[in-house]
Amino acid sequence: MVEELSSYTPQDLTDLDALMHELSATSFCNEELLNSALNDANVHVYVIRDEGHIVATGTLCIKHTLEFTIADIESVVVSSKCRGRGYGKELMTAMIEAAKKMNVHHIQLTSNPARVAANRLYQELGFERYETNCYKMILA
């Protein structure tokens, strides 16, 4: 079952950090980042637990622009030990439904092409690939 995280235990932080490492070798989750996310009204961290451990997570970030209210889905990862159980679909469906309740116009996400199963899931859920230049500037 998907839950929106509002507080956490030391074990939750350990589980989330491990999941971020599975997402990318350079990704991590620490207490400062998690507290910032949980204290931001426009950031919604969703998790799925299995046997008391967080085994899947995704973050729904709401942005208000002059045109629309938009959501970005970030940091979606299911533990490699738990893949194939439908957790990714359950998590994504919950975030899509939450965005609808928040009157979001559209949801954006990016996904590494190497994440074949994730990309297939996003397309199955109705996401369409669109042509754009995606840029980032690392500041820290």
Please provide the spans of the model-predicted regions.
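A short beta-loop-alpha structural element at the N-terminal edge
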Residues: M1-L16
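Active-site rim helix/loop that mediates acceptor-substrate recognition in acyltransferases
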Residues: A25-V47
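Conserved beta-strand in the GNAT
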Residues: V47, H53-I62, D72, V77
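A conserved beta-turn-beta hairpin within the catalytic core of GNAT-like acetyltransferases
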Residues: K63-I73, R83, Y130-E131
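Active-site acidic-Proline motif in GNAT/NAT acetyltransferases
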Residues: S79-K81, R85, P113-A114
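Conserved acetyl-CoA pyrophosphate-binding loop and the N-cap/start of the following alpha-helix
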Residues: C82, G86-A94
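Conserved active-site alpha-helix within GNAT-family acetyltransferase domains
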Residues: K89, H105, P113-E131, K136-M137
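Conserved GNAT acetyl-CoA-binding A-motif
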Residues: M92, A99-S111
